Regions:
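Charged, amphipathic alpha-helical segments and their flanking helix caps
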Residues: 1-34, 47-159
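Short, well-ordered secondary-structure micro-motifs within conserved domains or adaptor modules
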Residues: 35-44
């Protein structure tokens, strides 16, 4: 399997550990219509590569962007919250939990040869019952940058 998949699986494993508030952590950007809320999605969006010319065997430095997307029902729309907190509070709590769990050290504990992991950005949006009948929800997207290296022709092996 490609190293991106290894990293994506490691991130999902870390986020699924207790304590957790998530019904599930999906390794895809497409949730099923029967998904139990709240949930997280983990997927790679891009990967930049640079060949290091100082190595005769061909080494690629890679930088992948992994998105962690938290999906939450808007309070008061059947989420059982009783409107005790605002959607902003819930989005901030989600962000804090992900940032607390997902660190360079926790990733290296699962995938030892990664070079670094850093939070690049966080975006938040709210979708209120749009025309297609979807659930009113909030989405928090965190972009994480992971750097690592592979040998030329061996994208399945970290070095």
């Amino acid at each position: 399997m490609h190293v991106r998949q290894t990293i994506r699986e490691a991130v999902a494993t870390i986020l699924a550990t207790t304590p957790t508030n998530w019904a599930s952590v999906l390794q895809t950007r497409i949730a099923t219509t029967r998904q139990v809320w709240p949930f997280l999605m983990v997927y790679a969006v891009d990967e930049a590569t640079e060949q290091l010319l100082i190595h005769p065997t061909g080494i690629y430095d890679r930088t992948a962007t992994i998105h962690v997307v938290g999906m939450l029902k808007v309070p008061g729309t059947g989420d059982g919250s009783g409107n005790m907190e605002t959607v902003e509070d819930r989005m901030d709590a989600l962000s804090a939990e992900v940032e607390t769990k997902l660190t360079n050290a926790t990733l290296k504990a699962v995938v030892a040869k990664t070079q670094s992991l850093a939070l690049q950005s966080t975006s938040m949006e709210i979708v209120l019952n749009d025309e297609d009948g979807s659930i009113s929800h909030a989405a928090v997207t965190q972009a994480w940058v992971v750097t690592y290296a592979t040998a030329e022709g061996l994208p399945e092996t970290l070095i």
